[in-house]
Amino acid sequence: MSQVSTLIDVDKPLFDLSTFAGRFQYFAWMTDPRTVVVSSDRLLEAKAMVERYRKGDQSPPLKPEEVHYNMKLYNSAFHPDTGELQNFCGRMSFQVPGGMLITGGMLAFYRTVPAVVLWQFINQSFNAVVNYTNRNANSPTSVTQLGVAYVSATTSALVAAIGCKNYWSKKATPLFQRFVPFAAVAAANFVNIPLMRQNEIINGIEVKNDDGVVVGQSRLAAIKGIGEVVVSRIAMAAPGMLVLPLIMERLEKLPAYRRIKWINAPFQTLLVGCFLCFMVPTACALFPQQCSLDTSIMRTFEPELYEDLEKKTQGKVPKRVYFNKGL
């Protein structure tokens, strides 16, 4: 058993992350909602095992499946840049239970302005925690920047939600009014994520060569990574928030369903959860987490950084550099 366990490299992915299918398998494994209920002590125990294995100390011997489970706990709960235990609500493994409750509420209670304001406030508070938790941690963000990002995103979501609601209530069908929550979520993501990670855009994020050696700080890499995260987050929410209103529009016309109106909110919440179980790993897998950037683009848009690269590599600039884009 000991010989088997020594063959396990805890830093080597169990899936092929160069393909969408491999990334989907990895994120379905890593964002498993069941890991949310694992205690902090057990998570720290998993981290200790991973750190021992990295140092070459693979005792006591464990079965491969036990090692893999500890790797799963470690990857789901600890930040890839700092190794710190992530905020409970900010972990991607909490996206299904947290997202289903909040999205279900937004879809079920969209008819009045106070309800829209309440649920958008809750949603943006949750998003702020998720965005901060899954940032590139090598670019620190001040409390002031966090506050500005939170207030700006919440305001943009409310403006989009109330604006769409007031406009569509007069000119659109009841079906289109059901899409108000998605319009607000999409608008807020374009504001929340860049502002929450504005320090990365201002100062750049660490980029590495093929050997994992830091070769500079690139603002262009930050913009690319954050842009991909925005697309992923909107894609994560889109199916549930666009398909579910169509389903509910049909169901609410049925006499049988009208007699059990109390089931509306829990039913929508459950359906959103079903969508998210599939969409969380799908959205995370759209782009590689360890993103890359062609250095020829850096030469055009970041000439100073490219000159530094030439000096550090003695003219042998790598074709691509790599960085953690966050989730």
From Swiss-Prot:
<dbReference type="Pfam" id="PF03820">
    <property type="entry name" value="SFXNs"/>
</dbReference>
<comment type="similarity">
    <text>Belongs to the sideroflexin family.</text>
</comment>
<keyword id="KW-0472">Membrane</keyword>
<dbReference type="GO" id="GO:0015194">
    <property type="term" value="F:L-serine transmembrane transporter activity"/>
</dbReference>
<protein>
    <recommendedName>
        <fullName>Sideroflexin-2</fullName>
    </recommendedName>
</protein>
<dbReference type="GO" id="GO:1990542">
    <property type="term" value="P:mitochondrial transmembrane transport"/>
</dbReference>
<feature type="transmembrane region" description="Helical">
    <location>
        <begin position="267"/>
        <end position="287"/>
    </location>
</feature>
<keyword id="KW-1133">Transmembrane helix</keyword>
<keyword id="KW-0029">Amino-acid transport</keyword>
<keyword id="KW-0812">Transmembrane</keyword>
<dbReference type="InterPro" id="IPR004686">
    <property type="entry name" value="Mtc"/>
</dbReference>
<dbReference type="GO" id="GO:0005743">
    <property type="term" value="C:mitochondrial inner membrane"/>
</dbReference>
<feature type="transmembrane region" description="Helical">
    <location>
        <begin position="99"/>
        <end position="119"/>
    </location>
</feature>
<dbReference type="GO" id="GO:0140300">
    <property type="term" value="P:serine import into mitochondrion"/>
</dbReference>
<dbReference type="GO" id="GO:0006730">
    <property type="term" value="P:one-carbon metabolic process"/>
</dbReference>
<keyword id="KW-0813">Transport</keyword>
<dbReference type="GO" id="GO:0015075">
    <property type="term" value="F:monoatomic ion transmembrane transporter activity"/>
</dbReference>
<comment type="function">
    <text>Mitochondrial amino-acid transporter that mediates transport of serine into mitochondria.</text>
</comment>
<keyword id="KW-0496">Mitochondrion</keyword>
<feature type="transmembrane region" description="Helical">
    <location>
        <begin position="175"/>
        <end position="195"/>
    </location>
</feature>
<dbReference type="GO" id="GO:0005739">
    <property type="term" value="C:mitochondrion"/>
</dbReference>
<feature type="transmembrane region" description="Helical">
    <location>
        <begin position="228"/>
        <end position="248"/>
    </location>
</feature>
<dbReference type="GO" id="GO:0022857">
    <property type="term" value="F:transmembrane transporter activity"/>
</dbReference>
<feature type="transmembrane region" description="Helical">
    <location>
        <begin position="143"/>
        <end position="163"/>
    </location>
</feature>
